[in-house]
Regions:
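NAD(P)+-binding Rossmann beta1-loop-alpha1 motif at the extreme N-terminus of oxidoreductases
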Residues: 1-69, 129, 198
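Short, well-ordered alpha-helix to beta-strand connector turns
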Residues: 31, 49, 63, 93, ...
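Rossmann-fold NAD(P) dinucleotide-binding segment
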Residues: 56-120
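Rossmann-fold dinucleotide-binding core
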Residues: 100-179
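Active-site-proximal catalytic alpha-helix in oxidoreductases
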Residues: 135-142, 163, 167-199, 211-221, ...
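Beta-strand segments within the central parallel beta-sheet cores of soluble alpha/beta enzyme folds
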Residues: 204-212, 263-267
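Interdomain hinge/lid region at the active-site interface
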Residues: 218-278
Length: 282
């Protein structure tokens, strides 16, 4: 996390949910002229409410750069070209960045449809809301050198691991591969915890041992910090969203998954809410 960018650009965060809102708050705290937009009512955003713009046209006209942190491709389409349509207006940003996890194929399609005068980059992030609030996200970025250079001061405020991986689509390709491994970790840890309970082993002791052994995973190591770590599967929650991430990975392979990927999705959908007492530092 570093100081504000030197340029005068006005930044918009579209989709001020569990990731987008703390990202916007980090930028504001660093002195960035940042505004938010969301389909929810402005008064739901607490101290950030004065920086929220409810009307999509007003939001598009105010912002030079828009970072999209909406849930999925359907919401991205609506934001860009649908009812909200910030990119089909005369007053619109000159740089649009998708930070949502989409498929690389969807990113290529979005890039091809950018209006004249609108640059594009993909910059999905990893780290969960607690790291978004700390400004320590990891960004995986795809785009032209000049475009990414313009964005880099913003990423350095919101993150401490910024990786420019190549042209448009490279960031998303890395993200879906990373998330595929992450989902494997979620399912494996939850299965191990269920087995430990069935076998009479203290689950906290198991987590402690795995954290310093070959069973270490991002999910297991951060289970008390991750806000969704105890969720059961529901299409509307974060566990449901990571099902979409596996499907984005499969889409990148032209649907070429096999038995393992099918079993992973099946196991993910069976996850029940986790009843685990908080750890000593949580």
């Amino acid at each position: 996390m570093s100081g504000p960018p030197s340029g005068p650009a006005t930044i918009g965060i579209a989709g001020c949910g569990t990731m987008g809102l703390p990202m916007a708050e980090c930028l504001l705290a660093a002195g960035v002229d940042v505004w938010g937009h969301d389909v929810r009512k402005v008064d739901e955003f607490g101290a950030f409410a004065p920086r929220m713009i409810a009307d999509a046209g007003d939001f598009a006209a105010r912002c030079d750069i828009v970072l999209s942190v909406v849930r999925d491709l359907r919401q991205t389409e609506d934001l860009c070209f649908g009812d909200q349509g910030i990119l089909r207006r005369d007053g619109r940003p000159d740089l649009f960045v998708t930070c949502s996890t989409l498929s690389p194929r969807a990113v290529a399609d979005l890039a091809a449809r950018m209006p004249d005068g609108v640059d594009f980059a993909d910059a999905p992030m990893s780290g969960a809301p607690y790291r978004a609030a700390r400004g320590t996200l990891t960004f995986m970025v795809g785009g032209a050198e000049a475009t990414v250079g313009r964005l880099m001061p913003l990423f350095q405020i919101m993150g401490d691991g910024i990786h420019h991986l190549g042209p448009v689509g490279s960031g998303m390709t890395c993200k879906v591969l990373n998330n595929f491994v992450g989902v494997v970790g979620v399912v494996a840890v939850r299965k191990a915890l269920a087995s430990a309970q069935a076998l009479g082993l203290d689950r906290r002791r198991l987590l402690d041992v795995m954290a310093m052994s070959s069973g270490a995973t991002w999910y297991g190591d951060n289970i008390d910090a991750i806000d969704w770590s105890r969720q059961g599967y529901d299409p509307g929650n974060t566990i449901g969203i990571i099902e979409k991430d596996v499907k984005a990975y499969l889409d990148a392979l032209d649907g070429g998954g096999g038995v393992f990927e099918t079993a992973l999705l099946d196991e993910l959908r069976t996850l029940e809410p986790l009843d685990l007492e908080p750890g000593p530092q949580s």
